Amino acid sequence: KNLDFENESVRKCIRIIGPRTNTWDSAKVGIASPPIKTKYGWLLLYHGVSKSHNTYRVGAVLLDLKDPAIVLARSTDPIFEPEMDYEKHGFINNVVFPCGMVVRKGLVYIYYGGADKVVGVATMKLDIILKALRSGISR
Protein backbone atom coordinates (compact mmCIF):
# COMPACT_ATOMS: atom_id res chain seq x y z
CA LYS A 1 0.00 0.00 0.00
CA ASN A 2 1.24 3.47 -0.87
CA LEU A 3 1.82 5.60 2.22
CA ASP A 4 2.60 8.76 0.26
CA PHE A 5 0.49 11.54 1.74
CA GLU A 6 2.15 14.29 -0.25
CA ASN A 7 -1.03 15.30 -2.08
CA GLU A 8 -3.29 15.07 0.96
CA SER A 9 -4.41 18.06 2.99
CA VAL A 10 -6.64 18.79 5.96
CA ARG A 11 -10.07 19.44 4.55
CA LYS A 12 -11.73 21.13 7.50
CA CYS A 13 -10.77 22.10 11.05
CA ILE A 14 -13.42 22.66 13.70
CA ARG A 15 -12.89 24.13 17.16
CA ILE A 16 -14.45 21.79 19.70
CA ILE A 17 -13.42 23.34 23.03
CA GLY A 18 -11.18 26.13 24.22
CA PRO A 19 -10.14 27.75 27.49
CA ARG A 20 -12.93 29.01 29.77
CA THR A 21 -12.92 32.24 31.78
CA ASN A 22 -12.03 32.06 35.50
CA THR A 23 -11.71 28.27 35.64
CA TRP A 24 -9.06 25.61 36.17
CA ASP A 25 -8.65 25.49 32.36
CA SER A 26 -8.63 29.24 31.64
CA ALA A 27 -5.15 29.53 30.06
CA LYS A 28 -4.91 26.59 27.71
CA VAL A 29 -6.38 23.22 26.80
CA GLY A 30 -5.17 20.31 24.70
CA ILE A 31 -6.28 16.85 23.74
CA ALA A 32 -5.14 14.07 26.05
CA SER A 33 -6.13 10.93 24.15
CA PRO A 34 -8.22 9.69 21.26
CA PRO A 35 -11.93 9.65 22.15
CA ILE A 36 -13.56 6.41 23.26
CA LYS A 37 -17.03 5.45 22.03
CA THR A 38 -19.64 4.92 24.76
CA LYS A 39 -23.40 4.43 24.50
CA TYR A 40 -23.92 8.08 25.49
CA GLY A 41 -21.33 9.67 23.21
CA TRP A 42 -17.61 9.92 22.56
CA LEU A 43 -15.64 10.35 25.80
CA LEU A 44 -12.69 12.67 25.29
CA LEU A 45 -10.12 13.59 27.92
CA TYR A 46 -8.16 16.84 27.75
CA HIS A 47 -5.57 18.68 29.81
CA GLY A 48 -6.08 22.22 31.00
CA VAL A 49 -4.07 24.92 32.76
CA SER A 50 -5.37 27.98 34.62
CA LYS A 51 -4.07 31.50 34.19
CA SER A 52 -3.44 31.82 37.94
CA HIS A 53 -0.92 28.95 38.22
CA ASN A 54 0.82 26.38 36.06
CA THR A 55 -0.92 23.21 37.21
CA TYR A 56 -1.85 20.71 34.51
CA ARG A 57 -5.16 19.01 35.27
CA VAL A 58 -7.47 16.68 33.35
CA GLY A 59 -11.05 17.26 32.25
CA ALA A 60 -13.62 15.23 30.34
CA VAL A 61 -15.88 16.06 27.43
CA LEU A 62 -18.79 14.07 26.02
CA LEU A 63 -19.23 14.45 22.26
CA ASP A 64 -22.24 13.53 20.14
CA LEU A 65 -22.04 10.02 18.63
CA LYS A 66 -23.26 11.08 15.19
CA ASP A 67 -21.48 14.44 15.06
CA PRO A 68 -18.41 14.49 17.32
CA ALA A 69 -17.99 18.22 16.69
CA ILE A 70 -20.97 18.76 19.01
CA VAL A 71 -20.12 19.00 22.72
CA LEU A 72 -22.86 17.44 24.83
CA ALA A 73 -21.18 18.03 28.19
CA ARG A 74 -17.91 19.22 29.71
CA SER A 75 -16.64 18.71 33.24
CA THR A 76 -16.81 21.81 35.42
CA ASP A 77 -14.08 20.56 37.72
CA PRO A 78 -11.01 18.52 36.79
CA ILE A 79 -11.45 14.77 37.06
CA PHE A 80 -7.75 14.26 37.81
CA GLU A 81 -5.05 16.59 39.15
CA PRO A 82 -1.56 16.33 40.68
CA GLU A 83 -1.71 14.81 44.15
CA MET A 84 1.25 12.48 44.51
CA ASP A 85 4.76 13.79 45.20
CA TYR A 86 5.99 12.46 41.83
CA GLU A 87 3.23 14.50 40.10
CA LYS A 88 3.99 17.64 42.09
CA HIS A 89 7.81 17.62 41.90
CA GLY A 90 9.92 16.88 38.85
CA PHE A 91 11.27 18.63 35.77
CA ILE A 92 8.00 20.54 35.46
CA ASN A 93 6.12 20.67 38.77
CA ASN A 94 2.38 20.05 39.18
CA VAL A 95 1.70 18.12 36.00
CA VAL A 96 -0.57 15.22 35.11
CA PHE A 97 -0.50 14.99 31.33
CA PRO A 98 -2.56 12.10 29.91
CA CYS A 99 -1.55 10.64 26.58
CA GLY A 100 -3.90 7.67 26.32
CA MET A 101 -6.78 5.79 27.85
CA VAL A 102 -8.22 2.31 27.65
CA VAL A 103 -11.53 1.00 28.98
CA ARG A 104 -11.52 -2.53 30.33
CA LYS A 105 -14.34 -4.13 32.33
CA GLY A 106 -15.88 -0.75 33.13
CA LEU A 107 -12.64 0.80 34.33
CA VAL A 108 -10.88 3.64 32.52
CA TYR A 109 -7.08 3.35 32.61
CA ILE A 110 -5.54 6.80 32.06
CA TYR A 111 -1.86 6.67 31.10
CA TYR A 112 -0.11 9.92 31.91
CA GLY A 113 3.15 11.73 32.49
CA GLY A 114 3.75 13.05 36.00
CA ALA A 115 5.82 16.23 36.43
CA ASP A 116 7.67 15.37 33.20
CA LYS A 117 9.57 12.81 35.27
CA VAL A 118 7.50 9.60 35.46
CA VAL A 119 4.87 7.68 33.52
CA GLY A 120 1.89 6.52 35.53
CA VAL A 121 -1.55 5.02 35.18
CA ALA A 122 -4.67 6.15 37.02
CA THR A 123 -8.03 4.39 37.04
CA MET A 124 -11.59 5.64 37.27
CA LYS A 125 -14.92 3.92 36.81
CA LEU A 126 -16.37 4.72 33.39
CA ASP A 127 -19.93 4.91 34.70
CA ILE A 128 -18.96 7.55 37.28
CA ILE A 129 -17.41 9.79 34.61
CA LEU A 130 -20.40 9.34 32.29
CA LYS A 131 -22.94 9.88 35.07
CA ALA A 132 -21.23 13.11 36.10
CA LEU A 133 -21.13 14.36 32.52
CA ARG A 134 -24.74 13.37 31.82
CA SER A 135 -26.07 14.95 35.02
CA GLY A 136 -25.69 18.41 33.60
CA ILE A 137 -22.10 19.38 34.22
CA SER A 138 -21.54 22.62 32.33
CA ARG A 139 -20.37 22.91 28.78
Question: Where are the language model's segments positioned?
Answer:
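Beta-rich carbohydrate-recognition and catalytic domains
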Residues: 1-27, 36-91, 105-108, 112-139
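Beta-propeller and closely related beta-sheet repeat lectin domains
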Residues: 31-34, 97-100
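Short, flexible loop/turn motifs enriched in small residues
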Residues: 94
